[in-house]
């Protein structure tokens, strides 16, 4: 069995799918259990994207969940708690600093880093019934930090020529 994967579509999404599979998560089953019902697309100002999913089995009365991924600093600013071994705890300043220090270490080594977080969308959130009314301002707050995803993101082949051109300039 090869340890290489062939993927179609967005490379970041594909990488996250491979990571999930290597962690023992049945991604097909997960997609069926939590179908995506809305996406708040990535934009360069927010430096993140969010997806909203229905839960086939409500968790504590919660029927929907939002997931967010993006630049660690920006995602971390939206988090008020952290998931530690399945236990939701308040996110402390020292934990924030540790996370950003880890991010900086990875980035200095040329690795691409994404932060991942979630939020259970409960009735107390007072969200509108219409999914089209779900905005980043309503969804992307009070998040629970899950972790950092670190990827080797090699430069595109055309980068070598661009760098050489810059050196000759």
Regions found by a protein language model. Give the residues of each.
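Cytosolic catalytic regions of ATP/NTP-dependent phosphoryl-transfer enzymes
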Residues: 1-145, 151, 157-169
């Amino acid at each position: 069995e090869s340890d290489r994967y062939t993927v179609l579509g967005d490379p970041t999404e594909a990488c996250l799918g491979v990571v999930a599979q290597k962690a023992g998560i049945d991604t097909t089953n997960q997609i069926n259990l939590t179908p995506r019902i809305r996406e708040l697309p990535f934009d360069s100002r927010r430096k993140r994207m969010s997806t909203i999913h229905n839960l086939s089995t409500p968790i504590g009365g919660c029927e929907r969940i939002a997931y967010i991924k993006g630049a660690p600093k920006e995602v971390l600013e939206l988090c008020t708690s952290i998931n530690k071994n399945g236990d939701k705890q308040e996110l402390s300043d020292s934990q924030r600093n540790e996370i950003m220090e880890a991010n900086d270490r990875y980035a200095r080594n040329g690795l691409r880093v994404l932060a991942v977080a979630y939020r259970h969308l409960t009735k107390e959130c007072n969200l509108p019934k219409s999914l089209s009314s779900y905005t980043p301002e309503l969804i992307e707050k009070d998040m629970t930090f899950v972790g950092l995803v670190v990827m080797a993101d090699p430069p595109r082949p055309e980068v070598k020529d661009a760098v050489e051109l810059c050196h000759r300039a």
